[in-house]
Amino acid sequence: MRAETIEALRESQRLGFLGARPVEQAAEHAAAFATALGPLPDGARLIDLGSGGGLPGLVLADLLPRCSITLVDRRQKRTDFLQRAVRRLGHEHVEVREADVAVMARDVEAGVETAFDVVTARSFGPPETTLRLARRLTHAGGTIVISEPPTGQRWDQGFLQELGLNDERVGPVRVFHVKP
């Protein structure tokens, strides 16, 4: 991970966009998203939901330079920060959008927006809401990665079946595979 990315995350923390956890630990946790995904094809489209503080989005931008990454948050202060950070880090493969994820999901379903190959989320919202929105943004055969609490099973298998998902825990994240 680049030192410049760690510094951008420290700035995010100073602005109150990240919690008190040491930035290096938070960045390592974010790197687990890329590890869980494994190799992605060049040009794969990834969207990070609620990217405001830069995790995991800025870390993924470092680790997945051949992907087209969209960082989305509905708060302008956070998207302004992300745009500055992306510019400073030279991530030409990253787009920052100030948008409501539910509106984006409707646009994908209406064919106005193209579905994504990968959706990531960390501390976005209630688990079922997060997963339902992520599924609406992901095409058949795509992948969703969501951060997990250290213990416990919070995903009802009937709900996952309803959404057409298979899941597995990979370290600190849960990976959902959208059935083709």
What feature does the model see in each segment?
Residues L55, L64-T70, R74-P180:
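S-adenosylmethionine
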Residues A31, L58, R132:
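Active-site phosphate/pyrophosphate- and oxyanion-stabilizing loops and adjacent acidic/basic residues
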Residues A36, V59-P65:
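Alpha-helix C-terminal capping segments
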Residues M1-I47, K77-V94:
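Class I SAM-dependent transferase core
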